[in-house]
């Protein structure tokens, strides 16, 4: 049995080593004959000698290709000839491959990146883990005790525990008297003893839990320190463990033994909320182990008892690790056999990598050349690519019995229907596109279904249908009318109670449609109705003199005039058509004056007289046509009331009378009423007619309708939203009793798919199935068969239309075919065997086979320049704000929202010059993203959160290169700023404009003044001049030129030799507005000879003040200090701001007179500093007061300035933007003053600046970078941010030796990369200059690092990378030229983010087209299968991953937000699958909620619809606002977060609705819930963000099965029918695509998608999505949930489950639950200083830390929640601190937040609410009141 392989080098040549176990003995075999090679494809074979002559260098040795052999291979199914280039040593390949690829004769090189030892296994056909050897397993674990903040490996190892099949023991160097503890003298001896045990026991497999990243690296570190050689391996040459970097973590290899780290395997295999050893042990094996709290660790060294607890804890860790290892190792061994690589590699690989290694091995066997991995550009393209998703069926909720788990309705031809325009016809004669009479009136036929049927038909009142056809039945009680769909066959059983829905107008409507009059009669009626509404007949007699006859005559003029709206284009076309058809003329069409109306006129007498006659006899015309014309012109569809309304004035009551008579003749119900009002002293009346009820609307739509499509659509919408809840006999519907019989029938049966009008509030969840490997095989889906030319046979994928050649087996399908066959054979063996061990091993094997077959985040700080002002913003909030404010300008491009901007600039890096630049931001960008995100932390404390496809910058060979988020790892070097460029200028503060942003109450007593001298009458004169310029003054004032000269100085006008020219009209308009306010509000103050105006009177116009004028004004309080309006920012003002931001205070308080007093105080203990503060303050604000430790500036203007510029509290203080606009001396002055207040010299000789504000900490770093200070570190301690500076500043030199930070060093790896030789350590810039100047370094290469010495960037090293899942928006800026910007905590340069993960983007055999095709076929076959089993075998499918929806949705199309019915998105049928129709959408997004409850936009790739065949409920929000949803549709309720609930489960709960302005959501409780009758379409959309990915050409998804039952049938019948169905459906499914019978379950319930539980015939419970293990759940919650599951599934008693919950709730409320069941265990996952949010466990941990108790990451805090008020975190104590005499736990918390949430996710499926589960009827004002009842 091969355990592993590697290679060593002897005499410069590689020797393969094979680590094996044979006949129970370990051995190492050597093979010195295997040579490394790559393949090269050449344009010209004659160049091979040149290629062989190419030279490279490896460790100082010249290397070249040693041989070249021409070989025949296949590449993507095509024959190719390539050269096999053979090398002497594996390391020669990277030394030469780049040069070979660059040769002009080389097209490309292949297989150059396959590691040598792995290549050996592939080429030799060797399979690790094959054989029957029994492997010895041993697990170990260490316990350490190091202080928080200490470096890794500094603290001592306390204990080492180990476990194997024989024993579990602990080694320690403390005296502990326990039988399983071995005590040695010290830590060094303990490690030596452990090494001895490993060598004695000689395990083949050494198991750890996170041993790669903790136990082994820590052990290695301590062994090095103590001088112990860790001889853990079996390799005599290299017996010590070796640490390898693997992605963003580490991996430790022990040669000769398999180091099996469980952690990555568990993370890949099972889904848990937390992956602590305790949680995994309990979830996988159902066992628990002891927990050790932080307080006990602290007391370890104090008591022997504590040491015993630690020893037990350590021993149990080792035992749990061993037992888990035994569980998981066999599956990984099977996977290793399948893949053909070692367990060490396989167990640490992602699914994508596993598939790739498998394909590489098969490719070699088939002589197939492997494609290369994508380069950077191709990788980005793949990341941006998306494709259409799979199919899902909504689960049928509730408890079901006798469920079969399978992996993977109609009328006879003479059934009558009414077709619009035809009347009654046979259903067999209906055509697609016809309109037939449906429940909503006329409904368009989208699809006619036809099937051959032989069997029983059910006859219900003459309606014949197949047994499974559904008929709506109405039942009534005192409270509501309920409409339920019942199967036709159920009517025979007598169980159906109620009435069926009919229409008494069936014959009448049919007659109308059949006996419609001629077109002429219809046109006459429509014209008459139009003129009745908005037309006029005008006759005018005019007297004139007829000169030819010499006498007076009378001229009779006739005119017909119709007025319509300019936008009523369809009505205009109809009127013109009518005049043409009836009279053969085209009337005149003109715009009516300046209105938006059109006037249609004709002056022909004959036409006039004919129309006059029509109007006289209007009541005898064809009533529907008259009404259609009248209502088109005079009626509106009221969208609020969902009614049709006609309104006529006082003198037109007769028109309403005519309309009413016509409606009566058709039987259309209506209401009439009058509205009286007074206008111009005259009483007037409005006469109103309204069609209100659903029956009236449907009759109007059916018999009359509108002319225009817009009004018809509005009417359809009104019908859709009208109520069906109180269904009773009315003008359209009739409730009838029924009679039923049955008869035999053989022939064709038909069904219709109609357009309907359901709506749905955005919660589209699409999950997916993975029968896809079979599809790949069946349809030969592979990159080498895609669109292959010259084939005879193709399979074409539905929906997407890609063609796949069937003439030869594709590479991937042929491999998958073998895998599928292999798995099927294994599963057959599993079913046949009764040996439990063999069954388990076979299961491991089939699971291994199945595994194969199958930008910037929002809270990052961003410095930008907006409208000329430097601002620090959170990137997400900033971009969201802009996109919200400019919605109409947002474009959507490839799932990305883009907003082009022109007033924003970013701080950017020129990658060529390495200089900081300020660059224009071209666009703001945001993407929707779901996937991995990375928190990257640098040694300097800088942090940034980025997506996997977002890039930072690093240095490679002296050049700036991008490094992706997923590639960043600990130790990498990242570029950060050394110097940031600013727009330095003379900075001034316009005080009036600055304080104009404050509330009016803050500036109520502020005035502005200007001296009278020289300004007498100036303001009035200027206003008159301005009015004259604007043409509003008839006479020019005498002193006009004086004002004109002034306006020229201000730049508004230009004087010409004669006259003037206005150069800035807009500016002049604003200037005039200012002067209008000044003239109106200016007052003369004689005491001071000044003009005065109250600031608030001109506040909204102060921005119009020209600076030249403003310089002559002062601003201040009426009786207090006033200062110049324009304040020049010099070094002194910079110091004032620095003093204030660091240790200043600004406050306002009531004084003794009842008014307000304002002051700004600057604090310091140093008298010299106080003196400087005083001098500066008096310079700007006049007299001040000096106290013992502060300078008090009692001036309101100082307060307003400080508040506006810097903020007033320590937490919101900020550096004002004006500092960043100022010159460098001003910035230094600010920094110096800030350092005086909040700076000090740290004991480590570093300078330190402190602040409580995260914003201010980032601003300080930015300020320092702007001054060229780069040796910076950022820390966070006790709520305070610390910015450490490790270099001298101009105002402070410590003259002491300091450790150099990374930004002031050149890392040795950079030096080695540039100079090609070893460097012992990093070197300082000074040392580098010294070496360069002395000639010790190559001057040419020195220039490559010039940017570090003289550029604007430095390097910082990655300290930590933490990966997590993220869903939501990610953000970008498009920056002109550079496409990068400064961002993140502490600020670093970042590039654009590319996101999205559809397919495995680094795959060699990647193909988007294959992915889309496989998914399309998947949808097709799943829907077909479900349709067949339901309709032909009578099953009810309970769960198969699906989605329905039926509400109005809010969409964004092409960047524009719209409120539309979902049906309006369905514009065409792009493809059909079964009875479902699909319309592909472009640039459409739906509004939905993310997991954080935030409104976000998600892409909608398609909309789907099908006929509703289930109950529909109407949920009333208000009396007029409701939503209709199907019975199994999920709504989202706000309860302990966001939860799914069905319509009948939401009573008493809050739904989530959008605010009117879409600014957020609000919570609303439904008014009523009622069942309605509905027979239209239901619609579905996919919302992007589903879990799917394409890995190396193979689609990996979840379940490919579904659960089904036949209600009421016996188990044996169901099993039999299920197997019959399998035989039937598999004969219809192609190729390998077969459905399997996976099992039978006695009982099960289905809560929601991916959430169900079933129990099999052996009593085994299987759950999905109903986790009973959660980190922050107490034992009582987990125990209660488990009991509820057993009661429902094992005992078939939901009632018992409810009683269990009630009993537990009562026991908790009465304090009868043992304390240990209430303990909540939570883990500390990071340093306490990093926690921003303080949860209960963090609160306790911080209390322990305050007592001197050390709490490290990984510590479990076990706590109890106490009764009381206030935050939970203030009411928690450790279990050990609980005193029953003093403390009471909080029953309310444990009931509401623990037990009920744990069980409600199950019991809600059965209609139970929270209130139903309490042992008392309700809870009024808290638990105390409840208990006292």
UniProtKB/Swiss-Prot annotation:
Q: Mind listing the GO biological process terms from this record? A: DNA-templated DNA replication; intein-mediated protein splicing
SUPFAM superfamilies attached here?
Answer: DNA/RNA polymerases (SSF56672), Hedgehog/intein (Hint) domain (SSF51294), Homing endonucleases (SSF55608), Ribonuclease H-like (SSF53098)
Identify the PROSITE patterns for this entry: INTEIN_C_TER, INTEIN_ENDONUCLEASE, INTEIN_N_TER
InterPro entries, per database record: DNA-dir_DNA_pol_B, DNA-dir_DNA_pol_B_exonuc, DNA-dir_DNA_pol_B_multi_dom, DNA/RNA_pol_sf, DNA_pol_B_thumb, DNA_pol_palm_dom_sf, DNA_pol_type-B, Hint_dom_C
Look at the named UniProt entry and state the broad enzyme category this protein falls under: transferase
Q: Does the keyword DNA repair belong to this entry?
A: no
Kindly indicate whether the keyword Methyltransferase belongs to this entry.
no
Q: Which family does it belong to?
A: Belongs to the DNA polymerase type-B family.
Query: Per its record, how is this protein called by name?
Result: DNA polymerase
Q: Which organism is it from?
A: Thermococcus aggregans
């Amino acid at each position: 049995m091969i355990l592993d392989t590697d290679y060593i080098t002897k005499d410069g040549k590689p020797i393969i080593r094979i680590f094996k176990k044979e006949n129970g003995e370990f051995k190492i075999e050597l093979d010195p004959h295997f040579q490394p090679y790559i393949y090269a494809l050449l344009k010209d074979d004659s160049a091979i000698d040149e290629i062989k002559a190419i030279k490279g260098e490896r460790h100082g040795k010249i290397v070249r290709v040693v041989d070249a052999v021409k070989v025949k291979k296949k590449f993507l199914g095509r024959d190719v000839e390539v050269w096999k280039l053979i090398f002497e040593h594996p390391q020669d390949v990277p030394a030469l491959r780049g040069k070979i690829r660059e040769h002009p004769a080389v097209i490309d090189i292949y297989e150059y990146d396959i590691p040598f030892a792995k290549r050996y296994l592939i080429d030799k056909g060797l399979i690790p883990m094959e054989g029957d050897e029994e492997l010895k397993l041993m697990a170990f674990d260490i316990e350490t005790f190091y202080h928080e903040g200490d470096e890794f490996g500094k603290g001592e190892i306390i204990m080492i525990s180990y476990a194997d099949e024989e024993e579990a023991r602990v080694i320690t160097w403390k005296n502990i008297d326990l039988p399983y503890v071995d005590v040695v003298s010290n830590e060094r001896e303990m490690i030596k003893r452990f090494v001895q045990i490993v060598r004695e026991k000689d395990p083949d497999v050494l198991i750890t839990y996170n041993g790669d990243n903790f136990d082994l690296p820590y052990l290695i570190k301590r062994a090095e320190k103590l001088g112990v050689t860790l001889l853990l391996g079996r390799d005599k040459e290299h017996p010590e463990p070796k640490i390898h970097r693997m992605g963003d973590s580490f991996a430790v290899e022990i040669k000769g033994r398999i180091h099996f780290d469980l952690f990555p395997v568990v993370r890949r295999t099972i889904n848990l909320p937390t992956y602590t050893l305790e949680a995994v042990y309990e979830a996988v094996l159902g066992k628990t182990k002891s927990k050790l709290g932080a307080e006990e660790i602290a007391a370890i060294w104090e008591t022997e008892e504590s040491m015993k607890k630690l020893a037990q804890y350590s021993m149990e860790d080792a035992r749990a690790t061993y037992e888990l290892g035994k569980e998981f190792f066999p599956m990984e061994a099977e996977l290793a056999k399948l893949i053909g690589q070692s367990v060490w590699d396989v167990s640490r690989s992602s699914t994508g990598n596993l598939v790739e290694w498998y394909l590489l091995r098969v490719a070699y066997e088939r002589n197939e050349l492997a494609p290369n991995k994508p380069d950077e550009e191709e990788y980005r393209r793949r990341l941006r690519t998306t494709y259409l998703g799979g199919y899902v069926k909504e689960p049928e909720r509730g408890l079901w019995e006798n469920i079969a788990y399978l992996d993977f309705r109609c009328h006879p031809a003479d059934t009558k229907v009414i077709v619009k325009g035809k009347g009654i016809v046979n259903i067999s004669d209906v055509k697609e596109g016809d309109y037939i009479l449906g429940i909503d009136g006329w409904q368009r036929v989208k699809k006619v279904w036809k099937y051959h049927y032989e069997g029983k038909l059910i006859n219900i009142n003459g309606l014949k249908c197949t047994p499974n056809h559904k008929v709506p039945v109405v039942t009534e009680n005192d409270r509501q009318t309920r409409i339920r769909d019942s199967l036709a066959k159920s009517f025979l059983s007598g169980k159906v109670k109620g009435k069926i829905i009919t229409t008494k107008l069936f014959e009448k409507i049919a007659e109308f449609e059949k006996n419609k009059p001629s077109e002429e009669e219809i046109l006459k009626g429509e014209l008459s109705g139009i003129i009745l509404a908005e037309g006029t007949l005008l006759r005018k007699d005019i007297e004139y003199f007829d000169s030819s006859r010499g006498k007076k005559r009378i001229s009779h003029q006739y005119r017909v005039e119709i007025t319509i709206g300019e936008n009523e284009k369809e009505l205009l076309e109809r009127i013109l058509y009518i005049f043409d058809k009836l009279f053969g003329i085209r009337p005149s069409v003109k715009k009516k004056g300046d209105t938006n109306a059109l006037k249609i006129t004709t002056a022909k007498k004959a036409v006039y007289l004919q129309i006059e006659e029509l109007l006289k006899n209007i009541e005898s015309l064809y009533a529907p046509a008259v009404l259609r014309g009248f209502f088109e012109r005079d009626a509106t569809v009221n969208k609020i009331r969902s009614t049709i309304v006609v309104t006529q004035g006082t003198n037109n009551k007769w028109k309403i009378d005519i309309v009413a008579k016509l409606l009566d003749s058709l039987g259309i119900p209506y209401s009439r009423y009058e509205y009286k009002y007074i206008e111009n002293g005259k009483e007037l009346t409005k006469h109103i007619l309204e069609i209100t009820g659903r029956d009236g609307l449907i009759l109007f739509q059916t018999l009359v309708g509108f002319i225009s499509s817009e009004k018809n659509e509005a009417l359809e919408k009104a019908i859709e939203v009208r109520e069906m809840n109180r269904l009773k006999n009315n003008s359209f519907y009739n409730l009838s009793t029924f009679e039923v019989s049955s008869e035999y029938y053989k022939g064709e049966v038909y069904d219709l798919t109609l357009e309907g009008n359901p709506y749905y509030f955005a919660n589209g969840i699409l999950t997916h199935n993975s029968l896809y490997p079979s599809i790949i095989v069946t349809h030969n889906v592979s990159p080498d068969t895609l669109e292959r030319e010259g084939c005879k046979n193709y399979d074409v994928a539905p929906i997407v239309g890609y063609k796949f050649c069937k003439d030869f087996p594709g590479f991937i399908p042929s491999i998958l075919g073998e895998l599928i066959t292999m798995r099927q054979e294994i599963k057959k063996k599993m079913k046949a065997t009764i040996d439990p061990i063999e069954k388990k091993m076979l299961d491991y094997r089939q699971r291994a086979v199945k595994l194969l077959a199958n930008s910037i985040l929002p809270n990052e700080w961003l410095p930008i320049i907006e409208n000329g002002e430097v601002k620090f913003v959170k990137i997400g909030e900033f971009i969201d704000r802009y996109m919200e404010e400019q919605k109409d300008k947002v474009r959507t491009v490839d799932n990305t929202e883009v907003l082009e901007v022109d007033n924003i600039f970013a701080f950017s890096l020129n990658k060529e010059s390495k200089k900081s630049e300020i660059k224009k931001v071209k666009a703001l960008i945001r993407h929707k993203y779901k996937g991995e995100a990375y928190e990257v932390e640098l040694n300097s404390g800088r942090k940034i959160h980025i997506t996997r496809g977002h890039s930072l910058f690093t240095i490679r060979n002296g050049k700036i290169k991008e490094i992706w988020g997923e590639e960043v790892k600990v130790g990498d070097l990242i570029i950060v700023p050394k110097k940031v460029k600013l727009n330095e200028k003379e900075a001034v503060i316009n005080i009036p404009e600055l304080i104009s942003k404050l509330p009016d109450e803050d500036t109520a007593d502020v005035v502005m003044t200007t001296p009278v001298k020289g300004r007498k009458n100036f303001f009035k004169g200027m206003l008159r001049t301005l009015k004259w310029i604007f043409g509003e003054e008839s006479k020019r004032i005498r002193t006009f030129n004086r004002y004109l000269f002034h306006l020229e100085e201000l730049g508004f006008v230009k004087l010409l030799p004669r006259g003037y020219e206005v150069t800035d009209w807009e500016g002049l308009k604003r200037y005039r507005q200012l002067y209008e306010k000044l003239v109106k509000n200016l007052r003369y103050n004689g005491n001071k000879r000044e003009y005065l105006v109250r600031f608030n009177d001109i506040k909204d116009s102060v921005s119009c003040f020209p600076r030249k004028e403003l310089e002559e004004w002062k601003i201040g309080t009426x009786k207090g200090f006033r200062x110049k309006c324009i304040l020049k920012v010099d070094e002194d003002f910079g110091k004032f701001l620095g003093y204030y931001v660091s240790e200043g205070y600004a406050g306002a308080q009531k004084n003794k007179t009842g008014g307000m007093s304002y002051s700004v105080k600057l604090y310091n203990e140093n008298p010299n500093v106080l003196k400087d503060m005083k001098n500066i303050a008096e310079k700007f604000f006049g007299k001040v007061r000096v106290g013992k430790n502060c300078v008090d500036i009692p001036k309101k203007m100082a307060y307003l300035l400080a508040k506006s510029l810097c903020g007033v509290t320590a937490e919101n203080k900020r550096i004002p933007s004006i500092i960043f606009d100022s010159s460098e001396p001003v910035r230094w002055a600010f920094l110096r003053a800030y350092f005086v207040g909040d700076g000090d010299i740290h004991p480590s000789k570093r300078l330190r600046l402190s602040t409580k504000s995260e914003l201010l900490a980032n601003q300080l770093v930015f300020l320092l970078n702007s001054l060229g200070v780069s040796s910076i570190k950022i820390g966070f301690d006790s709520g305070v941010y610390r910015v450490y500076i490790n270099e001298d500043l101009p105002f402070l030199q410590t003259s002491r030796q300091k450790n150099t930070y990374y930004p002031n060093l050149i890392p040795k790896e950079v030096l080695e990369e540039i100079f090609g030789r070893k460097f012992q350590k990093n070197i300082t810039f000074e040392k580098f200059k010294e070496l360069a100047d002395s000639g010790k370094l190559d001057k040419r290469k020195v220039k490559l690092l010039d940017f570090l010495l003289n550029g604007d960037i430095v390097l910082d090293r990655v300290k930590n990378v933490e990966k997590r899942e993220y869903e939501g928006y990610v953000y970008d800026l498009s920056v002109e030229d550079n496409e990068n910007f400064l961002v993140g905590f502490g600020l670093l340069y970042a590039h654009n983010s590319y996101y999205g993960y559809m397919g495995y983007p680094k795959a060699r055999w990647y193909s988007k087209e294959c992915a889309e095709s496989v998914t399309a076929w998947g949808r097709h076959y799943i829907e077909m299968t479900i349709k067949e089993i339901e309709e032909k075998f009578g099953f009810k499918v309970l769960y198969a991953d699906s989605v329905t929806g039926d509400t109005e949705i809010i969409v964004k199309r092409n960047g524009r937000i719209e409120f539309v019915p979902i049906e309006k998105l369905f514009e065409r049928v792009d493809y059909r699958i079964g009875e479902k129709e699909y319309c592909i959408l472009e640039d459409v997004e739906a509004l939905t909620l993310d997991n954080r409850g935030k409104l976000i936009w998600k892409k909608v790739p398609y909309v789907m619809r099908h006929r509703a065949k289930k109950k529909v409920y109407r949920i009333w929000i208000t009396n007029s606002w409701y939503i209709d949803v199907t019975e199994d549709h999920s709504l989202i309720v706000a309860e302990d977060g966001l939860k799914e609930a069905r319509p009948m489960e939401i009573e008493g709960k809050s739904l989530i609705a959008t605010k009117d302005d879409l600014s957020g959501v609000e919570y609303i409780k439904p008014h009523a819930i009622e069942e309605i009758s509905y027979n239209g379409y239901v619609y579905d959309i996919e919302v992007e963000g589903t879990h799917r990915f394409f890995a190396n050409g193979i689609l990996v998804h979840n379940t490919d099965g579904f659960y089904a039952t036949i209600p009421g049938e016996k188990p044996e019948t169901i099993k039999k029918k299920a197997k019959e169905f399998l035989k039937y459906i598999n004969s219809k499914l192609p190729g390998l695509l077969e459905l399997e019978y996976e099992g039978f379950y006695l009982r099960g319930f289905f809560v929601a998608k991916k959430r169900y539980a079933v129990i099999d015939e052996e009593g085994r419970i299987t759950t999905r999505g109903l986790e009973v293990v959660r980190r922050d759940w107490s034992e009582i919650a987990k125990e209660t949930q488990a009991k509820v599951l057993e009661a429902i599934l094992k005992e078939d008693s939901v009632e018992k489950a409810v009683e269990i919950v009630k009993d537990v709730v009562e026991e908790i409320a009465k304090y009868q639950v043992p304390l240990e069941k209430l303990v909540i265990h939570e883990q500390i996952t990071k340093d306490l200083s990093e926690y921003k949010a303080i949860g209960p466990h963090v609160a306790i941990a911080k209390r322990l830390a305050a007592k001197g108790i050390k709490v490290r990451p990984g510590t479990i805090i076990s706590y109890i929640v106490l009764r009381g008020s206030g935050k939970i975190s203030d009411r928690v104590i450790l279990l050990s601190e609980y005193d029953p005499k003093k403390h009471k736990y909080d029953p309310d918390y444990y009931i509401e937040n623990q037990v009920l949430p744990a069980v409600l996710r199950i019991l809600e499926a059965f209609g139970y609410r929270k209130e139903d589960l309490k042992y008392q009827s309700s809870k009024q004002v808290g638990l105390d009141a409840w208990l006292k009842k």
